[in-house]
UniProtKB/Swiss-Prot annotation:
Chain intervals with Low complexity compositional bias: 273-284
Subcellular locations according to the entry: Cytoplasm, Cytoskeleton
Residues found modified as Phosphoserine: S636
Protein name, entry field: Mitosis inducer protein blt1
Keywords carried by this UniProt record: Cell cycle, Cell division, Coiled coil, Cytoplasm, Cytoskeleton, Mitosis, Phosphoprotein
GO CC annotations on file: medial cortical node; mitotic actomyosin contractile ring; mitotic actomyosin contractile ring, intermediate layer
GO biological process, one term: mitotic cytokinesis
Coiled-coil region: 496-575
Function: At the onset of mitosis, forms a medial ring structure before the arrangement of the medial actin ring. Essential for the central positioning of the division septum before the cell divides.
Region (Disordered): 1-53, 266-293, 634-659, 671-700
Highest taxon of the lineage: Eukaryota
Source species: Schizosaccharomyces pombe (strain 972 / ATCC 24843) (Fission yeast)
């Protein structure tokens, strides 16, 4: 767009549509933009006087009072034209690109939905392709052999038997071409049925919808190159759309400024003289005439119409961009993954973990209370002077037991704070081992307390008995709680193991689906390659059929030329016989003979004819035979003799060319000059025959 969009008055009027210019072109009938990235290069002209000349008559004194020195208005006009052209080209390019991308996405989606799953489909396709190739090879080999045989027979000679065989060969060749066409049509029909069968097989793919949902959900989590590509395309679309909006606003501002400038110059006009100097007229006193006002109004209307059309195109572009974005999002996500079942299982596991945590917290509180009771029991035991050493040893053992109990309590506290570190959360049966260990520790503690109470009696035995009773009760409650917790932990462990098995099964299903997807993709690629090979084979065979048809036409033309030569040779060989049979002996001289007897000529009287080519038959002078004046048979090749009747006048005006059927009949042997119809020719028949041969030879 090196030139301005408003370079002539006819183009400006063509935008508005209110003028009847037969040479104008529609403003929006733009060519298809090329699919290249980036904006088109817009070279700008720096020669403002040259631009002023190109913008005539709009910069003319009678239209707009813009002098050549006023470069600002010229730059405004130039920027308007360049911006309008670039925006239109950009809108066309982006609209075409969005249409192409939408069509490509539709084809890709249909291709994904039409992929076959069974291996029998691939085998059937390969069998059909092999059958098509076999049929085409057989037909081409047969045609090649027939053409070779025909060429060999043509090279042998030009006898009647060869002509008959040639006619049969031509018929067989035509029949062979028809058979080839029929075979191609049948094979293409069969392949079309196979494609329809592939379309039907998409119903089988719908049965794998749940598995594909899982796979699509997993693919959504990962950033694939395709999603990155779509994101880049959408970002590019958004940038171009923003730039288009900015250009649109800029053009609107320029148009408003131009309109204000035109209004100001209309109100304050200074006419320019013929010498280029401004005349001393007061501004505003000299009003424009009606013609200039109409032209300025048309100019503004044309600009506003272009502005409105650009707005409509921008709206269409935004609509297509939104549709394309929706389509890209739908294709990248494929289908939304419904994970209600998995979320429900996760919620159940979370609730079970919370219940287990609460139970462990309660158990920890009970163990802490039991610890406090045991600490108080240690100080209740009074010292005895007699058994002080024994009591000290028992107290040491008791301290060890209390330390072990503290370890158990600390372990339960850590499990309550962090249930994930629990041994039974991953392995079934580990919780039962922990419960057994805890029970053994409690039993050992109970036995030691009983032994201490038996060895060291004290006046506070009632208190000790109550403490032991409370300890037994607490022990029983703890045992019940531990057993209940063990069962719960076992149940949770079993459920976690089942959940792990289910997750592994889902992982295996996903891997299997990925393998199936890879197989389907490879099958689709193979089918595409086979289809391309079939198309190339079909095009090659079509070219071979065309070449064979051309060869047949050439053979037919050669046959026609050979038949013409044969007819000429036959007529040349029959003319002496016709002329000799036309000279009858008068009946008066031979009254005794009832049959017509031709005059016998001595062999010495006939002088050998001059050999001439058959193309010289049109010139009757070249075919004169040198005979004596008394026994001269022909005056020319036309067969006109002094003793024979003259050719009818109708033969002179007969300019028709013999048809193909007559030539074929003459070539086969059913013409009047063939050996099957030889008879005694009368003088009238001979004359008629000579007239026909002359007319035919003259037209050859």
């Amino acid at each position: 767009m090196s030139k301005s969009a408003f370079t002539s008055k006819s183009q400006l009027k063509g935008i508005d549509g209110s003028f009847n210019d037969p040479f104008r072109q529609p403003s929006m009938n733009l060519p298809t933009p090329p699919h290249d990235d980036g904006l088109p290069s817009i070279p700008r002209s720096t020669a403002l006087p040259n631009l002023s000349n190109r913008l005539s008559p709009y910069s003319h004194r009678n239209y707009l009072p813009i002098p050549e020195a006023d470069s600002r208005n010229l730059e405004v006009l130039n920027s308007i034209s360049l911006t309008t052209g670039s925006v239109v080209n950009q809108i066309n390019k982006l609209y075409q690109r969005s249409c192409d991308n939408a069509n490509y996405l539709q084809d890709l989606r249909s291709l994904i939905l039409q992929t076959p799953t069974a291996e029998a489909n691939a085998t059937q396709v390969t069998e059909s392709l092999n059958q098509i190739q076999k049929i085409l090879q057989e037909a081409s080999s047969k045609d090649r052999e027939q053409i070779v045989q025909v060429i060999k027979e043509l090279n042998k000679g030009n006898s009647l038997e060869v002509r008959r065989e040639l006619g049969n060969c031509l018929a067989h060749l035509k029949k062979g071409t028809l058979n080839i066409d029929n075979a191609l049509q049948a094979s293409l029909q069969k392949y079309w049925k196979e494609l329809q069968y592939f379309n039907v097989s998409k119903d089988k793919l719908l049965s794998l919808e749940e598995s594909i949902k899982l796979l699509s959900a997993r693919l959504e989590e990962t950033d694939t190159p395709s999603s990155t590509h779509w994101i880049e395309i959408n970002a590019g679309f958004k940038e171009v759309g923003d730039e288009l909006s900015e250009n649109f606003q800029r053009k609107q501002e320029i148009l408003s400024g131009l309109q204000n400038n035109v209004i100001l110059r209309t109100n304050n006009r200074k006419p320019v003289g013929s010498d280029g100097s401004n005349s001393n007229f007061n501004g505003g006193e000299e009003q424009m005439d009606s013609k200039d006002q109409e032209e300025i109004q048309d100019y503004l209307n044309s600009l506003l119409s272009v502005h409105e059309k650009d707005g409509v195109l921008l709206q269409k572009f935004h609509n297509s961009y939104v549709q394309y974005q929706k389509l890209a999002v739908a294709l990248s996500k494929y289908e939304n993954f419904d994970a209600d079942k998995l979320f429900q299982q996760m919620n159940l596991a979370k609730q079970s973990n919370e219940t287990l945590l609460q139970t462990l917290t309660e158990q920890t509180d009970q163990l802490l209370s039991f610890k406090e009771t045991m600490d108080s029991f240690k100080f209740i035991l009074g010292p005895s002077m007699e058994n002080q050493a024994l009591q000290q040893g028992i107290l040491a053992e008791q301290q060890d037991l209390v330390a072990q109990l503290r370890d158990i309590v600390l372990r339960s506290e850590t499990l309550a704070e962090n249930p994930s570190n629990m041994p039974g959360s991953c392995l079934p049966g580990a919780s039962s081992n922990t419960a057994d260990e805890f029970t053994e520790q409690l039993n050992l503690l109970k036995n030691e307390v009983a032994r201490l109470s038996a060895i060291c009696p004290s006046p506070n035995s009632g208190i000790n008995a109550s403490v032991l009773t409370n300890a037994d009760n607490l022990e029983k409650e703890n045992l019940l709680l531990v057993n209940n917790n063990a069962f719960k932990v076992d149940d949770r462990s079993v459920s976690s193991v089942a959940l792990d098995d289910h997750n592994r099964q889902l992982q295996m299903n996903v891997e299997e689906l990925e393998g199936k997807k890879a197989d389907l993709t490879s099958k689709i690629n193979r089918l595409d390659k086979d289809f391309v090979k079939l198309n190339t084979t079909y095009s090659l065979l079509t070219d071979q059929v065309k070449t064979k048809q051309l060869a047949l036409q050439e053979i037919e033309s050669r046959v026609i030329r050979l038949e013409e030569r044969l007819n000429m040779l036959q007529k040349l060989s029959m003319q002496p016989a016709i002329s000799s049979s036309s000279e009858f002996v008068p009946i008066e001289s031979h009254p005794s003979s009832s049959a017509v007897v031709p005059i016998e000529e001595p062999k010495n009287s006939i002088i050998e004819k001059k050999r001439v080519p058959h193309n010289a038959a049109r010139n009757s002078v070249n075919l004169e035979v040198t005979l004596p004046n008394s026994k001269k048979r022909f005056s020319s090749f036309s067969g006109s003799s002094s003793k024979l009747p003259v050719r009818p006048s109708t033969a002179l005006t007969d300019k028709r060319k013999p048809s193909w059927s007559r030539r074929l009949a003459a070539a086969i042997g059913f013409s009047s000059g063939s050996p099957e119809k030889k008879h005694v020719i009368t003088s009238s028949d001979a004359g008629h025959q000579r007239s026909k041969s002359r007319s035919f030879s003259s037209k050859m």
